[in-house]
Every structure is written in C-alpha cells, then in structure tokens.
C-alpha cells in the first residue's frame, strides 16, 4: 500500500511543498522569514475576521465600534491590538525578507521576485486601507492626503480622486469601499502567495553561497519545519510582549481622537512602515514628481535583476557590495526617521539628501561596484 501523503491528490501537493521538498542544507535563519510571513498572514486574516464581526464601516459609528470592541467584547482589546501590531510585525518580516533577497541575489528567480513585488504593493494597499478604518484623526487625514495624491495624474487625476472618494470628500462612501477592499485583499494576497511559492518550487531555494545546491539537498521536514517553529515561537513572544506591555508603542496618539474634517492635525504622517516612502514623497517640491518618486521607490525593486552586474550571485564574498548594502539599510532608517519629523529645516535637507542617496546607491553605486569587484577578481 502506497503512503497516503504520496498518493492522495490533495495531500500530495502539501507533501511536495512542505514535507518532501528538497531544500539546500546550508540555508540560514534569514530564510525563516517566508514562513513567518505566512503565519503573520494567517494571524491577520483570523484576527481581522473577528474584528469585522463587531466593526461597522460607517462614519457615525466606526470610532464607537472600535471603542466597543476594546471595552465590551470578550478579549476584544487583545484581538484589536494583535491585529494592529501584527501588521507591524508583518512589515518588519517583509522588509527583512526583501533585504535577504537583495543581499543573497534571490532576485535572479525573476518570476518569484516580480510576484513578490506585486505582493508588496498589495500588502501596502491593504495596510493603508486598514489604517483608515478606525475613523480617528490620523485615519481621516491620512486617507484624505494619500488619496488626494492621485489628483497629480495629468488630465484624469481630479476625476479619479472623486471616483475613489465616492463624492467630493472622504466620507461614508469612501469608508464602506475601503472596508470592502480591506476585507477582500488578504484573500487575493493568499492566492498570490500560492503563486509565489509555485514559482519558487519550480527553481528551488537559493542559499547563502549563491551557488547551485542540487548536489546537496535535504528534506524540508523535519529539518526546516523545526527551524521554522522556533522562528514562530520567537515571533509570538515578541508580538504578545508588545501587545501586553505597550500596545500603542507603534501607533499614533492622534488616532484616539475622533475624525474631525474641520481640524487638521499639526503633523499628518502614516504608520511607521510607510515613513521611508513618505519621506521620499515629501522631499520633492513638485506634486507629480513626488508621487512618481514614491511609486518608483518601491517599483525600483523590479530593476534589481536587470541591474545585477556581478559574476557572483550572492554578496557573501563581495565586501564592497556588502558595505553598500548596509549603507542602503542605514539610508532607509534615516528616511524612516525623517518621515516622522515636521517639514522644517534641517529635516527637509536631510530628507532630500537621503532620497537622492537611496536612488543613487541602487541605480549607480551598486552595479558599478559589482563591475569593479569583477575587475579586481580578474573576471
């Protein structure tokens, strides 16, 4: 009798993806973030579903319904803060996952990489719409400012903004459609994750050396399942500690004030995980230029396979490229800090310098350094 996991049509798929999957024997903890993102997605869908049971997407009752969830629903505060801080964890892991892909040259798997970039856009859209839902001051003004950026699109811009708003300002129609999209997008993300994995399993995983590892593979289970479980445990300890001890650490105090269209907050800013892109947007005085820079700051990831000029895939044995990689990380941290500061001197100048450095490092410094390394190695 054949083993059921190898013969059953459905279980066979799971077996080939998570049990008998040949994996490189030398992948490090940097490869844990894929599974952690999967756990985060499941957690977000689950907590989001329970929140949706009590939330009302109406401008008059949205803020009260969130208060009701925290005060009156059994463990509602826990579900709400797990969902809010779970989003932060999601983005931390997402950025680590992308960073690992850049460092070890995983972008060479172009299909997997491009689906990943689309996934990033989908997750960012979902997070933005989720931030808008509690109908606090920052929710309302964040929605107004970010949707209003589309008015920079020539000719169709103003009409497009009013179409998204469902009126002449952010109001009930906007809230209802944002809630609908926030609810459906995670399902689309789940489908995209499956395509992401499908493409990945066509080629097999990359490894820290960047070399072909077909001659040295081990089964995914039990070696990497146990390693992933350890990662999940660390993640849950961090998330639960954050939720229990300081749930509002990553939030904005302005969002505890009900939305008021007549009163603008002194400093409108998005959640911390969008601050780097927000800083790039603000660093350009022209509206259309700012919007293009904002989009391109994420879309630039698509260019990594094209810009790769080194004869080696990974940065493991390329010290000069490693220096540039960490310079890029430091630059992104500076941009994140600047995005949270008011628009005044010296923050404006620092933001502009950091924005130029960001694009200059990726488009010019990294490819030219890789070519120089080839020369030094006489390749």
Swiss-Prot record:
Which residues does a ubiquinone bind? Answer: 201
GO BP field: mitochondrial electron transport, ubiquinol to cytochrome c
Q: How does it sit in the membrane?
A: Multi-pass membrane protein
Q: Which cofactor does it need?
A: heme b
Keyword Metal-binding in the entry? The reply is yes
A GO molecular function term, named singly, is: ubiquinol-cytochrome-c reductase activity
Q: What is the effect of changing residue 240 to M?
A: In strain: Isolate JLP 16556
Describe the effect of residue 187 to F.
In strain: Isolate JLP 16556
Cofactor mode of binding and number, as noted = Binds 2 heme b groups non-covalently.
TM segment ranges: 33-53, 77-98, 113-133, 178-198, 226-246, 288-308, 320-340, 347-367
Q: Quote the subcellular location field of this record.
A: Mitochondrion inner membrane
Give the record's keywords alphabetically. Answer: Electron transport, Heme, Iron, Membrane, Metal-binding, Mitochondrion, Mitochondrion inner membrane, Respiratory chain, Transmembrane, Transmembrane helix, Transport, Ubiquinone
Residues reported in the UniProt entry to bind heme b b566: 97, 196
One GO CC term on file = respiratory chain complex III
Major location (coarse):
mitochondrion
Residues annotated as binding heme b b562 are 83, 182
**One Pfam family cited in the UniProt record for this chain:** Cytochrome_B
Effect on the protein upon substituting residue 334 to I: In strain: Isolate JLP 16556
Q: How does it assemble?
A: The cytochrome bc1 complex contains 11 subunits: 3 respiratory subunits (MT-CYB, CYC1 and UQCRFS1), 2 core proteins (UQCRC1 and UQCRC2) and 6 low-molecular weight proteins (UQCRH/QCR6, UQCRB/QCR7, UQCRQ/QCR8, UQCR10/QCR9, UQCR11/QCR10 and a cleavage product of UQCRFS1). This cytochrome bc1 complex then forms a dimer.
Q: What else is known?
A: Heme 1 (or BL or b562) is low-potential and absorbs at about 562 nm, and heme 2 (or BH or b566) is high-potential and absorbs at about 566 nm.
Its family remark reads: Belongs to the cytochrome b family.
Role description: Component of the ubiquinol-cytochrome c reductase complex (complex III or cytochrome b-c1 complex) that is part of the mitochondrial respiratory chain. The b-c1 complex mediates electron transfer from ubiquinol to cytochrome c. Contributes to the generation of a proton gradient across the mitochondrial membrane that is then used for ATP synthesis.
What name appears for this protein in its UniProt entry?
A: Cytochrome b
Q: What gene codes for this chain? A: MT-CYB
């Amino acid at each position: 009798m054949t083993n059921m996991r190898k013969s059953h049509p459905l279980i066979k798929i799971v077996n080939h993806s998570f049990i008998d999957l040949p994996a490189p024997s030398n992948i490090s903890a940097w490869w844990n973030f894929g599974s952690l993102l999967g756990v985060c997605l499941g957690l977000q869908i689950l907590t989001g579903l329970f929140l949706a049971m009590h939330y009302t997407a109406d401008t008059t009752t949205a803020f009260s319904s969130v208060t009701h969830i925290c005060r009156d629903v059994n463990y509602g505060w826990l579900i709400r803060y797990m969902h809010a801080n779970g989003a932060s964890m999601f983005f931390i892991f997402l950025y680590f996952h992308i960073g690992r892909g850049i460092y070890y040259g995983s972008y060479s798997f172009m299909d997997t990489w491009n689906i990943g970039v689309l996934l990033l856009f989908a997750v960012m859209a979902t997070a933005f719409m989720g931030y808008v839902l509690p109908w606090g001051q920052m929710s309302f003004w964040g929605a107004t400012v970010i949707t209003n950026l589309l008015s920079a699109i020539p000719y169709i811009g103003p009409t497009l903004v009013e179409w998204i708003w469902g009126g002449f300002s952010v109001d009930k129609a906007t809230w209802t459609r944002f809630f609908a999209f926030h609810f459906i997008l995670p399902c689309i993300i789940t489908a995209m994750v499956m395509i992401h994995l499908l493409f990945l399993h066509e080629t097999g995983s990359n490894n820290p050396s960047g070399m072909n590892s077909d001659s040295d593979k081990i089964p995914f289970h039990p070696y990497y399942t146990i390693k992933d479980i350890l990662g999940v445990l660390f993640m849950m300890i961090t998330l639960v500690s954050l939720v229990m001890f300081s749930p509002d650490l990553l939030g904005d105090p302005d969002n505890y004030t009900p939305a008021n269209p007549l009163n603008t907050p002194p400093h409108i800013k998005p959640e911390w995980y969008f601050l780097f892109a927000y800083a790039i947007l603000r660093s350009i005085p022209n509206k259309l230029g700012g919007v293009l820079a904002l989009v391109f700051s994420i879309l630039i990831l698509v260019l990594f396979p094209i810009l790769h000029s080194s004869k080696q895939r990974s940065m493991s044995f390329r010290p000069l490229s490693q220096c540039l990689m960490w310079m890029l990380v430091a630059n992104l941290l500076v941009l994140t800090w600047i995005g949270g500061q008011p628009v005044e001197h010296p923050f404006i100048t620092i933001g502009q310098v950091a924005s130029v450095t960001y694009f200059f490092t990726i488009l010019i410094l990294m490819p030219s350094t890789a070519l120089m390394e080839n020369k030094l190695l006489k390749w």
